[in-house]
């Protein structure tokens, strides 16, 4: 085993462990001494609380061992101990623990990291609020003078507020008309996913929010009375002790609807109130710098969701589940609207004795009297002179009837529609209109009647304006559900169909050209293709049922609830046409009329598919029947094509550098192609939480997109594991939403010619090719790599962690690399501190480029300074390298690897260690820093804290995994030479629980699962 020491450096001793999910950095860059002191002060408070809770909850001897283990994680604590290393002391202490103490240690360190995460979120929130204050108070006269020697805006990738971006644009003389055109067509869509599911239980997350709230109260007041301070501290200790006694692990595998409920929390607690604030901040900043520009609609930023609708590889997502998900979402929105309208009714106490009322509102009240005579009889006397309250009473009744209708639909299911809704007479025709709201426009029209009446009397109501903004953004649906399914499911279903129909040639036997010809022919006929009353295979029946459910969903909820169908592993044009044909069969697509209520979205994932994508789309754009079914957008009413780019599988296939470059090139080629056909393109970025899956700072990633590819439109996945860190607190949510929006505005309005520099593109193509070759030589061509990964990482135990409704592998029973999903692939490497998918291959590629021509190093430095795309790549690699711990990684290998494969595994480890050294050397030379993350002192402070504290969890995990995997031998917690073996035996369930708790703790420390 490689032992660490305080003097160790380079590959064997990493410099840091990032405090945020693989590159998600706080706003402050570089940091200030004041911020550092604030962090240190708050850190002391949290550490003191943690120690107090451990001493209260654990037996004295055990608590002292845990505190000693924490102390030993700091190398300076061992100075003067006869040269004994930190690792040796930690191993010695772990060896002396029984399983109950090991479990307590895993829980204690997990609690510690989660408290630190809460602390840092609060500091990031405070930093964002501080950044808003100067822009609000600063006017043109006091603004800092424009610096002509500053880097061009196209090269600036620091996050910016609305005020900062609009000021920069004005100083660059960007015309108001150009800004207004962009804002009018601004279309930002954030899509929440369940996978990788956040490892923290929903119950624990609730307790974390309570702790965060108490910490904010304790730290927000500079001079609290002593009693109040002591009371807040007592409440904090009480809440953390309750947290300590709460089970961190899911007792049962969460269902899809559990994941839906967890996701809806962020909308209920944060986003419903945050989104109107986002628009107000945009409007305020815009009015200062571009006073003549019309404000954008509230729906410039909306939400989607895959939770309950992503069925790719998840058999638990059935048509019934998707139907109930839609009902859950609508239920939440109706409950929120009911609360808002009740509050509004309390506020709008305007009497007709003292204010005029617009005639349209009075006319609507007369119509409502006919529709709802019971309400009129109940409320008319009370609100006889208060028309706004009376109107809002009618609105409340309709909302409550809509909620009842929604409950009926949820209970009945998609195949059994509820009883016909109650109706009311309209213009003397009985039963002409439903009493409940059948569309969001009806609700919005009622609210606008009230607003227009207020405006006509020179009154305004911010609460009403806020509600109208929320209605524009969320509708009744809350978020649009994207259906996602793997391409072969459709081709298999059509193959079974054509076999049943006894076509001369079954679909599965056709070549691609034959498939396309047959699909286009069928699309042009009105003849039904799928016969009724046929007993299909289970998979085919499910595929057909999804489209039937979609049709029913749109009929009841409107198109907004679900209008995108994502086809994962798209390879050819037939993959898209298959979905169109199945949609046509059920009435979602009508080629004869040129109408479609479903947008077919290909997802290109592998490098080969990314390279093939332009040719595939070119053929489809030239096909009239396909092009005519694209929806129209924008002032020019261009046909819109949404297209998704996959980061996860392309990285798993070819490595980090190659994947990112191929995606970059594909975007340019696809945008050029779409423009040549007069098609508007909306790129959907399937970004994960980790660097290897496209994660990292969203603002940096958006600014790194090729110039001209956004044009105000972007769609991005927000992975389950990062939702809490981005949307768990109101100001953090606003910070994330504001920086995403400003990045889209900046990228769309400021032309970046650097993407078109031929020499830079040629260099990137070379290094991407070299990186891919080196990555594939290890990951795909080395016959021992799969065994190495399965033995040296906790991948098998990860599959037993009850955090997700989706299986870890695509195919049951398969144990090869291709069957493993990208998320557990990354999770396994992260837990064992290799983090290989996020950096391997980069060092060799860059080193070979510099070795061929030493002057290329200067070019690489210029790229890092001037090109946002290259700076993003290096920044992500730098952040990932700071998390790598080769000492600990080698301990995983030597302790968990099969002794018979030791030589092969040592060879693999040497390849990894050598590549780490090359990558570290080149990154430091390119950035000009002497150590990783050297440009941000505050980040380093947090990084060093996590780096020294997470180590014991790694040793604990290895000890528990060894026992778990070899119960016959029952090895001790550690095998230090000369120590007697621990003969205690434990059940498999006890050992598995301990191992899973270490997974929890390390994920909390790394703030990342997959």
Curated annotation (Swiss-Prot):
Stretches of the chain forming a coiled coil according to its record: none
Ranges for region Disordered: 1-36, 132-154, 967-986
Cellular component GO terms held in the UniProt record: cytosol
GO MF annotations, alphabetized: magnesium ion binding; phosphoenolpyruvate carboxylase activity
Keywords annotated in UniProt: Carbon dioxide fixation, Lyase, Magnesium
A Pfam family the protein falls into: PEPcase
EC number: 4.1.1.31
Key word Lyase present: yes
Needed cofactors: Mg(2+)
Biased composition, class Polar residues, residue ranges: 1-18
First-level EC class: lyase
Reactions catalysed, as given in the entry: oxaloacetate + phosphate = phosphoenolpyruvate + hydrogencarbonate
Catalytic residues (positions): 195, 652
Any one GO BP annotation for this protein: oxaloacetate metabolic process
Family according to the record: Belongs to the PEPCase type 1 family.
HAMAP family on file: PEPcase_type1
Job of this protein: Forms oxaloacetate, a four-carbon dicarboxylic acid source for the tricarboxylic acid cycle.
Protein name: Phosphoenolpyruvate carboxylase
Gene: ppc
């Amino acid at each position: 085993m490689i032992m660490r020491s305080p003097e160790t450096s380079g590959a064997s001793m990493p410099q840091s462990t990032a405090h945020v999910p693989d590159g998600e950095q706080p706003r402050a860059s570089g940091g200030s001494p004041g911020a550092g002191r604030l962090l240190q002060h708050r850190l002391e408070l949290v550490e003191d609380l943690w120690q107090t809770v451990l001493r209260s909850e654990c037996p004295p001897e055990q608590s002292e061992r845990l505190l000693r283990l924490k102390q030993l994680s700091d190398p300076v604590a061992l100075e003067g101990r006869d040269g004994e290393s930190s690792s040796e002391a930690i191993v010695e202490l772990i060896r002396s623990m029984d399983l109950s103490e090991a479990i307590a240690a895993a829980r204690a360190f997990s609690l510690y990291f989660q408290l630190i995460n809460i602390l840092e979120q609060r500091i990031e929130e405070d930093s964002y609020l501080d950044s808003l204050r100067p822009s609000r108070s600063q006017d043109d006269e006091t603004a800092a003078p424009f610096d002509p020697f500053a880097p061009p805006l196209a090269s600036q990738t620091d996050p910016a507020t609305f005020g900062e971006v609009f000021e920069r644009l004005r100083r660059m003389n960007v015309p108001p008309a150009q800004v207004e055109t962009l804002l009018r067509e601004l279309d930002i869509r954030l899509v929440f996913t369940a996978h990788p599911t956040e490892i923290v239980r929903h119950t624990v997350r609730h307790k974390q929010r309570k702790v965060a709230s108490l910490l904010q109260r304790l730290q927000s007041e500079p001079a609290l009375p002593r009693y109040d301070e002591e009371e807040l501290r007592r409440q904090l200790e009480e809440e953390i002790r309750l947290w300590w006694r709460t089970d961190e692990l899911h007792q049962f595998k969460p269902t899809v609807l559990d994941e839906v409920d967890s996701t809806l929390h962020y909308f209920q607690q944060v986003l419903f109130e945050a989104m109107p604030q986002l628009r107000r901040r945009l409007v305020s900043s815009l009015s200062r710098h571009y006073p003549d520009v019309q404000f954008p609609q509230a729906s410039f930023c909306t939400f989607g969701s895959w939770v309950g609708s992503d069925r790719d590889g998840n058999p638990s997502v059935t048509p019934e589940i998707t139907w109930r998900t839609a009902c859950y979402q609508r239920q939440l929105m109706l409950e929120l609207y009911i609360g808002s309208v009740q509050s509004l009714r309390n506020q709008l106490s305007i009497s007709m004795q003292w204010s005029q009322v617009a005639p349209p509102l009075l006319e609507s009240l007369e119509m409502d009297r006919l529709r709802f005579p019971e309400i009129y009889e109940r409320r008319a006397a009370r609100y006889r002179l208060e028309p706004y309250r009376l109107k809002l009473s009618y609105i409340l009744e309709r909302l409550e009837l809509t909620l009842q209708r929604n409950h009926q639909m949820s209970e009945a299911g998609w195949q059994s529609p509820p009883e016909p809704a109650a109706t009311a007479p309209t213009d003397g025709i009985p039963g002409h209109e439903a009493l409940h709201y059948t569309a969001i426009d009806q609700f919005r029209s009622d609210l606008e009647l009230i607003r227009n009446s207020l405006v006509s009397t020179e009154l305004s109501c911010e609460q009403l304006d806020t509600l109208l903004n929320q209605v524009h953004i969320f509708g009744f649906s809350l978020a649009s559900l994207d259906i996602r399914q793997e391409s072969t499911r459709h081709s298999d279903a059509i193959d079974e169909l054509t076999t049943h129909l006894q076509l001369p040639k079954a679909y599965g036997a056709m070549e691609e050209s034959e498939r396309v010809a047959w699909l286009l022919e069928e699309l042009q006929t009105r003849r039904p293709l799928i016969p009724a009353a046929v007993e299909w295979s289970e998979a085919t029946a499910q595929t057909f049922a999804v489209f039937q459910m979609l049709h029913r969903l749109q009929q009841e909820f409107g198109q907004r609830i679900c209008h995108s169908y994502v086809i994962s592993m798209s390879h050819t044009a037939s993959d898209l046409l298959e979905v169109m044909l199945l949609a046509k069969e059920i009435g979602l697509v009508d080629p004869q009329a040129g109408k479609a209520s479903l947008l077919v979205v290909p997802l290109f994932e592998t490098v080969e598919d990314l390279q093939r994508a332009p040719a595939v789309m070119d053929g489809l754009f030239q096909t009239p029947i396909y092009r005519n079914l694209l929806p129209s957008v924008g002032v020019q009413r261009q046909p819109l094509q949404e297209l998704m780019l996959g980061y996860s599988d392309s990285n798993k296939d070819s490595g980090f550098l190659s994947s990112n470059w191929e995606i970059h090139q594909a975007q340019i080629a696809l945008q050029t192609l779409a423009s040549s056909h007069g098609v508007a393109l909306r790129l959907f970025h399937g970004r994960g939480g980790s660097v290897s899956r496209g994660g990292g700072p969203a603002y940096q990633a958006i600014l790194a997109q090729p110039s001209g590819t956004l044009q105000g439109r972007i769609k991005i996945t927000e992975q389950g594991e990062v939702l809490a860190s981005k949307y768990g607190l109101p100001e953090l949510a606003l910070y994330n939403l504001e920086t995403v929006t400003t990045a889209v505005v900046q990228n769309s309005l400021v032309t970046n010619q650097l993407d078109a520099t031929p020499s830079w593109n040629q260099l990137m193509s070379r290094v991407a090719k070299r990186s891919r070759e080196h990555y594939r030589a290890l990951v795909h061509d080395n016959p021992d790599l799969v065994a190495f990964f399965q033995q040296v990482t906790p991948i098998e135990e990860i599959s037993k962690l009850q955090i997700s409704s989706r299986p870890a592998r695509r195919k049951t029973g398969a144990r090869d690399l291709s069957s493993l999903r990208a998320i557990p692939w990354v999770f396994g490497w992260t837990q064992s501190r290799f983090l290989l998918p996020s950096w391997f291959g980069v060092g060799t590629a860059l080193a070979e480029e510099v070795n061929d021509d030493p002057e290329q190093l200067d070019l690489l430095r210029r790229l890092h300074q001037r090109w946002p795309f290259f700076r993003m790549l290096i920044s992500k690699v730098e952040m990932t390298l700071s998390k790598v711990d080769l000492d600990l990684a080698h301990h995983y290998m030597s302790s968990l690897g099969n002794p018979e494969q030791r030589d092969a595994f040592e060879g693999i480890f040497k390849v990894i260690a050598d590549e780490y050294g090359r990558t570290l050397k080149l990154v430091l030379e390119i950035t000009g820093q002497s150590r990783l993350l050297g440009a941000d002192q505050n980040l380093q402070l947090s990084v060093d804290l996590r780096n020294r504290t997470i180590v014991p969890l790694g040793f604990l995990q290895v000890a528990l995994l060894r026992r778990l995997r070899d119960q016959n031998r029952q090895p001790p917690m550690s095998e230090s030479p000369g120590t007697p073996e621990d003969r205690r035996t434990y059940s498999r369930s006890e050992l598995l629980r301990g191992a899973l708790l270490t997974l929890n703790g390390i994920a909390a420390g790394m703030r990342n699962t997959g």
